[in-house]
Structure formats: structure tokens, C-alpha cells
């Protein structure tokens, strides 16, 4: 009986640690979008967009005639305003980013389902507003998972991934290295990009860097292998935050 009691205690603490670590990591990840502030120094003036009564975001070159529209899904801290303000003018076409439900001015609760909903509703709005344009999906870091999801459920011209991951355990394990193998079961709202990749039929371009210490070059090679039709480019001296500055 003592042995059984001992193992039950171990199991109890194992579960407590697993679920607690997941809660902490998810809270941190979401806080980057919920609590991020607008940056003061921007290169391009973002235009506020209300996609529907509860979903908002920003865009640039919204009136510019173009055969392409870029839908951008950002990494941590790069809310829609910041993404558009820093990166949008580097592209000679319409550039749009939405804030996930439950963040910034978008109402509701942030979770996996509403992040996916954000993506599809952003796409549907863009398709309606720009019916003649090809839609290109771009994702960076945390945003690459939802970008991959969208490319698998909607028709897009191409998908660009900068510093991607296979599921969020690749991110969580950088800080709390416990979510390996079957222990990934503790992760709630897991963005399973490797599974989404199986549904992507458009050309995919994966970008990494030997200088990226957050989501490294070797991981990007594994990410590229998840797709049926992908190309990969590894740079030498690009940091994790600077891919779109190339």
C-alpha cells in the first residue's frame, strides 16, 4: 500500500507541474498580444480596420491597385498596429494584419478556436474587398502556426514562414523544457502547425537563420519537411526579430 501511495503522490505532483507549466506558458504567450503597446516610432501609418463588429486590425496601401494582398500573422509583441507600422511599406501591395479575438480592440476570448476564427474571418474579408487579388499569407514566429492553419483551409497563392515551429512545444521548451513526446498532452490550445501543413497545397517558403537562437535553423529544416511543396532559405546573420527587415 505504501508503494501505491508513493506512486500516486508522484503522479499527482507530475500532473500539477505539467498543467501548471502549461498555464504559465500559455498566459505568457497570450499576454504578448493582450498587453502589447503601440510603438511610437513607426515607418508607415497604419489604417484602422473593423472587419466586423468584434474583430479589428490595421492595414496599409488599402486603396493601392495591386494583384496581391498580404495577410500577416505576427510574432510576440507585434500586434497588428506595430506589424503594419514597421513592415507594411516594404511590400508594394496591400498589407493587412488582424488582432486576435480577446486582444487589443478585438472583443472576445483568446484561445485556439478564436485565433483560427480570426484568421478565416480576416481572409474572408480580404477576399470580399479585393476579389481580383491573389492572397499571400505571411507568418513570423508564434504567428506562423495560425498562418499555416489558414493556408490549409483557404485558397492562397503562397505561404511564407519566417522562424516557424511544428507545435508550440518547440516554443515552450525553450523556457520550460518538459513538453517532450507524450508530455505534450499537457499543452492546451496547442497550435499544431505540422498537422496543419498536411492540408497546405500552395507553394511554401520557409526562412530561417543560423543567428536565430529562438527558433533555430535546424528546426526550420524540420518545419519545411512538414509540407509537401516547400523551399527553404537559411541566412547567416539575421536575428529572430529581423526577418522582415531583409
Positions of the model-derived regions?
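Hydrolase active-site cap/lid region
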Residues: 144-196
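Membrane-embedded segments
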Residues: 54-125, 138, 145
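Short alpha-helix in the alpha/beta-hydrolase fold that links the catalytic acid
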Residues: 84-85, 193, 202, 216-225
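Short beta-strand/loop motif that positions the catalytic acidic residue
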Residues: 200-201, 205-208, 212
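Alpha/beta-hydrolase fold nucleophile elbow
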Residues: 130-141
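Acidic catalytic loop of the alpha/beta-hydrolase fold
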Residues: 210-215, 240-241
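Catalytic histidine-centered segment of alpha/beta-hydrolase-like enzymes
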Residues: 238-246
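An N-terminal hydrophobic leader/cap segment in hydrolases
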Residues: 3-51, 56-60
Amino acid at each position: 500500500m505504501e508503494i501505491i501511495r508513493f506512486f500516486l503522490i508522484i503522479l499527482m505532483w507530475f500532473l500539477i507541474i505539467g498543467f501548471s507549466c502549461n498555464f504559465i506558458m500559455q498566459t505568457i504567450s497570450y499576454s504578448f498580444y493582450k498587453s502589447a503597446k503601440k510603438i511610437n516610432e513607426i515607418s508607415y501609418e497604419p489604417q484602422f480596420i473593423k472587419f466586423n463588429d468584434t474583430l479589428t486590425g490595421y492595414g496599409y496601401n488599402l486603396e493601392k491597385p495591386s494583384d496581391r494582398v498580404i495577410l500577416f500573422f505576427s510574432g510576440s509583441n507585434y500586434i497588428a498596429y506595430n506589424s503594419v507600422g514597421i513592415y507594411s511599406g516594404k511590400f508594394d501591395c496591400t498589407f493587412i494584419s488582424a488582432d486576435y479575438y480577446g486582444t487589443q480592440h478585438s472583443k472576445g476570448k483568446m484561445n485556439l478556436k478564436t485565433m483560427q476564427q480570426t484568421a478565416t474571418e480576416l481572409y474572408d474579408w480580404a477576399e470580399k474587398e479585393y476579389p481580383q487579388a491573389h492572397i499571400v499569407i505571411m507568418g513570423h514566429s508564434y504567428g506562423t502556426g495560425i498562418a499555416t492553419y489558414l493556408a490549409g483551409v483557404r485558397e492562397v497563392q503562397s505561404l511564407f514562414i519566417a522562424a516557424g515551429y511544428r507545435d508550440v512545444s518547440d516554443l515552450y521548451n525553450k523556457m520550460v523544457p518538459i513538453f517532450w513526446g507524450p508530455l505534450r498532452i499537457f499543452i492546451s490550445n496547442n497550435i499544431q502547425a505540422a498537422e496543419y501543413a498536411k492540408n497546405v497545397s500552395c507553394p511554401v517558403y520557409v526562412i530561417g537563420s543560423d543567428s536565430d537562437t529562438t527558433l533555430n535553423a535546424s528546426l526550420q529544416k524540420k518545419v519545411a519537411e512538414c509540407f509537401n511543396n516547400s523551399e527553404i532559405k537559411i541566412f547567416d546573420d539575421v536575428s529572430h526579430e529581423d526577418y522582415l527587415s531583409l
